[in-house]
Regions:
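Predominantly five- to eight-bladed beta-propeller fold
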Residues: 10-13, 63-64, 147-193, 197-203, ...
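Beta-strand-rich domains and repeat architectures in extracellular enzymes and scaffolds
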Residues: 28-64
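Short glycine/acidic-enriched loop and turn motifs that connect beta-strands
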Residues: 54-58, 149-152, 240-243, 333-337, ...
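Short loop/turn segments that connect beta-strands within beta-propeller blades
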Residues: 71-74, 114-118, 192-195, 258-261, ...
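Hydrophobic or amphipathic alpha-helical targeting/insertion segments
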Residues: 104-154
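Cap/lid segment of the alpha/beta-hydrolase catalytic domain
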Residues: 241, 469-593, 600, 635, ...
């Protein structure tokens, strides 16, 4: 067993009482904001424990602390509902063990404390660091997520050369997102009475949760109403490695009986009649089957109509119904397509029947939770550029419950309080008669706060804010405004774009204007809040922003979503130009002589492409982590299923499809001879999704052609910019470049 670990004695950062010199949002004010993370309701529904991360720019680091706050049981006005949470101290990932005890992570172990932050005790004492945890219903066991060594692809260093840094690699997926893969996560079950640990995937070279972003939500304990039954676990796993992993998104949900201790007997809920052992055998005997790894899986046998019934796409995030009869999970239909429509699948564990209960919602389900009747599910998803709350029955009757110009985030069911037959002369409490959900909400001008949402009747939900984490900063700022606008595209479709206006907006003036190019390429331009691509701070610097929901974005139906794959430089680029041209023609405050185009990832690719095809519309460009040379990108990226699906074919195939031929012939690097506009290129050298050589190549090409250009390179950042001082440098460089050319 590992030695007891002391909690961190470093200076603890808490809420920053920054006093602003003006009402303009600055990078420093943005990084002074607290960021609400995971949260959990108490078993009686009266309190919420939640984490907030604070940053110190001076020390260039962050810490996360836990608060507890009351949840009103009855309808309350927002001013009455908001209260200051009680700070409990350092920690993250809080969960309630009972009405008074909270478990949380600190320094790689599980700790407990009471609801006032006192009596802090280390609960686990395990080898390795715990990255996530989930208690069994009877709280006698807990699943721990820990990393185990993995050397199937990167060889172990020779024992006599312990300081060598070279890596001997024999297959693909040797690096993922921002790290070389020399360990993978496994789920362990710890018996809290005996101290025994069981690695569910012991000896298996497969991940659970799935990298790089999967967490404890990919694992669930069965609930049956009998808290003594704590032996069944559902877990998510992609039973593949190396080349097979790199070209496939096929993950499954497995049902593991802890009493058997044999993961190979775990039932595969996605592929009925098979087990985890069957998947392992297939992974060994025929890792890729008859798949051609240099072509899209779109038309290969794995996605034939016969195979689609076996869920060959992403399946993840299982959740059992309260009565234990059903398990639901998020499911994509096709293998190799990471942006397929994510549906809500429900499996009846008694009959084995699977059904999809969100088919009438022509967009993706982002998150969901069971209602306490085991017949209702609540979910969130994007539609027409906002993320709202919906409800579905087991028969697939979908009802929209909120209709806000905002994005609602992850959701939890607030338990009903202990029954009390009568209050106030026989009238039942509000919490007794309605479903209550705990959710987070944000929009372009407000970072995330927690809300209580009360579902009343068939189609109405009312919300009240519980936290006001950053009101002390927001109250010092002048807010901008935004509005949706529709325009006609070149193929006579209707396109929605957001118009974001600066604070103190004066309609009689003209403003420099930015075209925002979204990434993904299938990520929504909804009411997101970002600490980098933040429309509030852009508007505060005096810019109007035009943010189109171009072809390829979710929330406008599957046909609209799929019109981008294999056509990166086609209609989606015309949609960008339709939006900015409509804004210039219809909005008198848009200064057509001072336009810029900015974007990241696919948005950065879009900027590189527009640089050679904009017909002098724009006066400057900014590309962050964008793809520049698609032939190089095809084999540089680590998740090859992405380039296969999006490009349609490998660049070396003589029989490549017309879509692939069009993709490579229109790669931005082939139009550098048409570049004529200043460009800022930004890239992180730990970005293994789109390698930094892409940004360097674009910058080098621009300078060799005599074009004004700058390169902001981060040796220690990935696809994102995560460190405080790097983030502020990013914002300063971003606006210095825009101001130089547009003001």
């Amino acid at each position: 067993m590992a030695a007891c670990k002391q909690e961190d004695n470093k200076k603890v950062f808490t809420r920053n009482d920054i006093k602003l010199e003006s009402d303009t949002l600055t990078p420093e004010a943005l990084w002074a904001m607290g960021r609400i993370g995971s949260y959990a309701t108490s078993p009686d529904g009266s309190k919420v424990a939640y984490q907030v991360t604070y940053y110190s720019v001076e020390e260039n680091r962050s810490n996360t602390v836990i608060y507890v706050q009351d949840i009103p049981s009855a309808a309350a006005s927002e001013s009455d509902a908001i209260s200051s949470g009680t700070l409990l101290g350092l920690g993250n990932s809080p969960v309630w063990l009972d009405e008074n005890r909270i478990a949380f992570l600190s320094k790689g172990e599980i700790w407990t404390m009471n609801s006032k932050g006192k009596s802090r005790k280390q609960l686990t004492n395990t080898d390795g660091s715990v990255d996530g945890f989930l208690f069994s219903p009877d709280q006698k066991k807990v699943v721990l997520i820990k990393s185990v060594p993995f050397h199937d692809i990167i060889a172990e260093r020779p024992a006599d050369l312990p300081k060598s840094t070279g890596l001997v690699i024999n297959d693909l997926m040797y690096r993922h997102w921002d790290h070389y893969v020399e360990s993978i996560p496994h789920p362990f079950v710890l018996d809290l009475e005996s101290g025994e640990e069981l690695d569910i995937l012991e000896g298996q070279p497969f991940e659970c949760p799935m990298e790089p972003f999967g967490g404890i939500e990919q694992i669930a304990w069965m609930t049956t109403g009998d808290v003594q039954d704590s032996n069944i676990i559902a877990f998510t796993c992609r039973v593949k490695k190396g080349l097979a992993y790199s070209i496939s998104t096929d993950s499954d949900i497995f049902l593991f009986d802890l009493e058997s201790r044999d993961v190979k007997s775990a039932k595969n809920l996605c592929k009925p009649g098979t087990t985890f052992g069957d998947a392992v055998a297939a992974a060994i005997s025929s890792p890729i089957g008859d798949i051609d790894p240099s072509k899209t899986l779109r038309d290969q046998t794995v996605n034939s109509s016969e195979n689609l019934a076996n869920n060959p796409g992403y399946d993840q995030s299982p959740k059992f119904s309260p009565d234990g009869r059903y398990v639901a999970w998020l499911s994509m239909q096709r293998d190799g397509y990471e942006s397929d429509r994510q549906r809500l699948c429900v499996c009846d564990l008694q009959s084995g029947e699977k059904r999809y209960v969100t088919e009438s919602f022509d967009s993706s389900v982002d998150d969901f939770v069971w209602g306490d009747d085991s017949n209702t599910l609540y979910f969130i998803g994007v539609w027409h550029a906002t993320v709202n709350l919906y409800r579905t029955s087991l028969e697939g009757q979908v009802t929209q419950l909120t209709d806000d110009q905002a994005d609602w985030g992850s959701l939890q069911l607030i338990p009903r309080p202990t029954p009390n037959p009568s209050r106030n002369g026989g009238e039942k409490a509000d919490a007794d008669i309605c479903t209550r959900l705990l959710m987070e909400r944000h929009d372009y001008f407000h970072p995330a706060d927690l809300y209580q949402v009360r579902v009343i009747g068939d189609s109405v939900a009312e919300s009240s804010r519980l936290t006001a984490e950053n009101d002390h900063i927001l109250s010092q700022l002048a807010s901008g405004s935004c509005e949706p606008r529709w325009c006609k595209t070149t193929d006579n479709q209707q396109l929605l774009y957001w118009v974001i206006k600066p604070p103190h907006f004066d309609s009689s003036k003209k403003y420099p204007t930015l075209l925002f190019c979204e990434g993904g390429p299938q990520s929504p331009v909804s009411q997101f809040w970002s600490y980098r691509w933040n429309f509030y701070i852009m508007a505060s610097q005096g810019y109007v922003i035009i943010a189109p929901n171009r072809r390829g974005l979710p929330g406008f139906g599957q046909e609209w979503l799929e019109e981008i794959s294999g056509d990166w430089t086609g209609q989606c680029m015309l949609d960008y130009l339709s939006a900015i041209d409509d804004a210039c023609d219809s909005l008198p405050y848009v200064d057509r002589d001072h336009l810029g185009a900015v974007g990241a990832s696919f948005g950065g690719f879009s900027v590189y492409y527009l640089a050679g095809h904009h017909n002098k519309r724009f006066k400057c460009f900014i590309s962050h982590d964008g793809a520049f040379n698609l032939e190089a990108m095809y084999t540089e990226t680590e998740e090859n299923w992405f380039s296969n699906w999006e490009y349609d074919d490998a660049y070396w195939n003589r029989d490549r499809t017309p879509a692939a031929d069009r993709t490579y012939k229109n790669s931005p690097h082939l139009a550098v001879d048409q570049w004529d506009t200043p460009i800022l290129c930004i890239h992180g050298e730990k970005d293994y999704r789109i390698n930094a050589t892409q940004g360097m190549s674009a910058f080098n090409a621009a300078r060799m052609r005599g074009i004004e250009a700058e390169l902001l390179i981060y040796p220690d950042e990935n696809h994102w910019v995560l460190k405080p001082q790097n983030g502020i440098l990013w914002q300063r460089t971003f606006f210095a470049w825009l101001n130089r050319w547009l003001k």
